[in-house]
């Protein structure tokens, strides 16, 4: 089969012929239809400092995908050949305290698909049946391919009740934009998103944010005044990992405000902890998706009319992966899709 492989410990990816993966009695063999390119994949392609520590070559990368079940193991139930499926990219041990308590997203032994084991940038991928999500209702293939990052957005956005709340989102990357769409759909009063990229702020406007604010030119306080917010934001969703974004978020929260933080900082940084304490602000770290409450929520949101189409800005055949990765790395668009059927 064809696969995109990190063949060498150096920058680049290689489209190669590799053996089809074998599957065991509790596994599912999936014919990949479409995949999404993630920031993690860009790091692996560039072979930066993180990738050098995290990845062992050779490796088939990729963890955002949709596919059709090609075969199932002898012990697999409730999944059938021909089912349309996506996959949870965090593989857990199933034996630790958190896993046994049903908190699998908190497993201390999580292995990442396409990082710690061969992934989905290939014609076929194998996953444990427990990591396979069957789409029981019709879903657009491009959207099904990005259920992994969509899940990050949903997990973050729905960390706190949103109805009637004023929400600040720092970082208008694809996940930030999806989180904005979710917050709007879930009943937030005002949704403000910030970035320094006009191209991405334009995408955010397409999902119905109240204000898309370029913080290179204006401050968050300016945005508050424009919307008539006198007491600050109720909910903060930090998606950028930028120290200045987190500091500005803390400075613009109301007393008792709640912050969900998905953005991963590159290094340690200082924040105004005195303000967090005296304003009684809650800060919650978010990583991945809750298994499988987040997946259920994603499906229900889409059934209820949530429109993520503006987030998809590029589609390429898998043989054009270099152009697709360049597009994704430009930082100018949304999600980029690779089609494995052409």
Swiss-Prot record:
List of catalytic residues: 40 (charge relay system), 43 (charge relay system)
UniProt-annotated binding residues for NAD(+): 175, 195, 200, 262-264, 286-287
InterPro entries: ADH-like_C (IPR013149), ADH-like_N (IPR013154), ADH_Zn_CS (IPR002328), GroES-like_sf (IPR011032), L-Threonine_3-DHase (IPR004627), NAD(P)-bd_dom_sf (IPR036291), Zn_alcohol_dh (IPR050129)
Keyword Methyltransferase: no
Location (main, coarse): cytoplasm
Location(s), subcellular: Cytoplasm
Binding site for Zn(2+) 1: 38, 63-64
Residues annotated as binding Zn(2+) 2: 93, 96, 99, 107
Enzyme Commission no: 1.1.1.103
Superkingdom, natural source: Bacteria
GO molecular function: L-threonine 3-dehydrogenase activity; zinc ion binding
Keywords: Cytoplasm, Metal-binding, NAD, Oxidoreductase, Zinc
Residues in coiled coil: none
Catalytic activity: L-threonine + NAD(+) = (2S)-2-amino-3-oxobutanoate + NADH + H(+)
Its job: Catalyzes the NAD(+)-dependent oxidation of L-threonine to 2-amino-3-ketobutyrate.
Family according to the record: Belongs to the zinc-containing alcohol dehydrogenase family.
Protein name: L-threonine 3-dehydrogenase
Lineage, top ranks: Bacteria, Bacillati, Actinomycetota, Actinomycetes, Kitasatosporales
Gene name linked to the record: tdh
């Amino acid at each position: 089969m064809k696969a995109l492989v990190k063949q060498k410990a150096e920058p680049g990816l290689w489209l190669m012929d590799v053996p089809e993966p074998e599957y065991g009695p509790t596994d599912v063999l999936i014919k990949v239809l479409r995949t999404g390119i993630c920031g993690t994949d860009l790091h692996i392609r560039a072979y930066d400092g993180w990738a050098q520590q995290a990845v062992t070559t050779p490796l088939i990368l990729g963890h955002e995908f949709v596919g059709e079940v090609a075969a199932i193991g002898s012990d697999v139930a409730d999944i059938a050949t021909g089912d349309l499926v996506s996959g949870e990219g965090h593989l857990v041990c199933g034996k630790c305290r958190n896993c046994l308590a049903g908190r699998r997203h908190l497993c201390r032994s999580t292995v990442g698909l396409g990082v710690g084991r061969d992934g989905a940038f290939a014609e076929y991928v194998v996953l444990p049946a427990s990591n396979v999500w069957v789409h029981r209702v019709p879903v657009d293939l491009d959207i099904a391919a990005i259920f992994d990052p969509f899940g990050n957005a949903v997990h973050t956005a729905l960390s706190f009740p949103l109805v009637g709340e004023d929400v600040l989102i720092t970082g208008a990357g694809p996940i930030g934009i999806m989180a904005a769409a979710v917050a709007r759909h879930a009943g937030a009063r005002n949704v403000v998103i910030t970035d320094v990229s006009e191209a991405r702020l334009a995408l955010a406007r397409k999902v119905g944010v109240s204000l898309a604010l370029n913080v290179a030119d204006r401050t968050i306080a300016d945005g508050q005044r424009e919307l008539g917010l006198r007491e600050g934001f109720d909910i903060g969703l930090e998606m950028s990992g930028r120290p200045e974004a987190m500091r500005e978020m803390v400075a613009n929260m109301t007393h008792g405000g709640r912050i969900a933080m998905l953005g991963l900082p590159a290094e340690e940084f200082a924040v105004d902890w005195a303000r967090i304490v005296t304003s009684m602000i809650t800060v919650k770290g978010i990583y991945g998706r809750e298994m499988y409450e987040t997946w259920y929520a994603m499906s229900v949101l889409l059934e209820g009319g949530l429109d993520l189409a503006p987030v998809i800005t590029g589609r390429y055949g898998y043989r054009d992966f270099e152009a697709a990765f360049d597009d994704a790395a430009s930082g100018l668009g949304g999600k980029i899709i690779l089609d494995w059927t052409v």
